[in-house]
Amino acid sequence: MAKKMTFGWYHGMKAGLLGLLSCCLLGSCDSLMHDDLPPCFTGAYLHFVYDYNIQRADMFNDHVGGLVVFVYDENGKFVTRQEAANSSLAQPLKSHDFAMQLQLQPGKYHFAAFAWQKAYSETLAARGAKFRVEMPQQGEDISRLHATLDRQQGIVENQAMPLDTLWQGLSKGIVEVKSLEMVHDTISLVRDTKELTLSLHQIDAPADISVEDFSFEITCANGTIGHDNSLWEDERLTYKPYFTWDTDFRDEAGNVKERTAHAAMMFSRLVLYPVAQNEQNAMLSIFNKKTGEEVVR
């Protein structure tokens, strides 16, 4: 008799625990039992890293201030987009545990992202040339997603301002979202804007030089970047310095003994083409304004 009672008590306790567990699961998900409980989301948490840099360290939180994520289905058709950015009131992207929460229906998805130093809307409102993204329409193919740099008749008019840094990233594969689950995926960002500082110094008559005597330019057909970081076919653009200055080296009497001329430039990413396609490579040219001579090419 005692054995039967123990057996019945054990199974009664087991059934009670399973019932309690089921109630907890139902009560914590999607507010099935009570309206005041938090909902259970279906979708994805997207994490971001920017470690493709000379420091070889993740600098996403320090550098990126705004991003736009574009969501595509498994066939590469546009579904939706979502933005996140720092502001004067909140700076979520500076948090090391930042993740973008996307509420999605169950299915398989691709994610593509463009990022800037600030919110995309703030970037567009600022002075100078900037990369513009044509927002896709519902059902549009991912192959049409791209960013295009401002230009006027082939000249990138920077208005004495550096380009706002552009990053691009893409999910490595298809991400599957299941019902009542949040999956995690990480997008690695690559910087698409580059910076170069040029310095000119004369060996003969080292003090007889000024940045005002020279013009600088870089030409390259690199103003349109696809969702996969590829360069689209484009016109050849001309980039000019956004800032120039001289550095003087003086003796104790204050006389200039040497001078160095400097020019700071920013431009879109460069690609090194093989010799057979050398005409597509970027070209740096420096001209002497007084003589018209091309001193560097």
Model-predicted regions and their roles:
Residues 30-34:
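Bacterial signal peptide processing site
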Residues 77-191:
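Short, low-hydrophobicity acidic/polar segments
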Residues 35-54, 189-203:
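A short, Gly/Thr-enriched small/hydrophobic beta-strand-prone motif that recurs across taxa
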Residues 25-28:
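C-terminal motif of bacterial Sec signal peptides marking the signal peptidase cleavage site
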Residues 57-63, 205-212:
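A short beta-turn/strand-edge loop motif at beta-sheet boundaries
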Residues 13-21:
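Sec-dependent signal peptide hydrophobic core
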Residues 67-125, 208-297:
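Tryptophan-paired
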Residues 1-11:
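N-terminal secretory signal peptides that target proteins for export/translocation
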